[in-house]
């Protein structure tokens, strides 16, 4: 079942109010999660085995699995976690969640990937210090406020967890660096 309510933010409608089939923002996240949740584990394993043979053919012995979280679905992270010992390539799991207790309980020592501090340049949501050239009234958006980011990074440091954050714009990068500087001083 992939259906997304037409009233959900991000469902593009045509002039007569009917969906065009283009899903953005929340509608895209809901649709993607519905699709990913519906995939059987056999399909996941088959896809991983195909990727593994290609990786090994090219001499690649480690690949980071950046899985789960609100942009995708936790099912892939859970699958990688459950089957990690079965792969011929080392696949450290970066669980894309800010729920450190959940990650810690699984015995994982890394978190992140698409934990988004800001957005993308193409959507004008990357947080810039100067306005966008084609939108002089807008500088993008910080998704994680500094105090929340500081606390999250400090928790990762206290628990000795490796952390990967998504930051594109220079304001977001500055915010991440500041959070790391503050965590180091704690």
Predicted segments with their positions:
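Divalent metal-binding segments
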Residues: 1-101, 121-172, 185-186
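Acidic/histidine-enriched ion/cofactor-binding microenvironments in catalytic or ligand-binding pockets
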Residues: 104-105
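Non-cysteine beta-strand/loop elements that form the S-adenosyl-L-methionine
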Residues: 109-125
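Phosphate- and divalent-cation-binding pockets in alpha/beta enzyme and binding domains
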Residues: 175
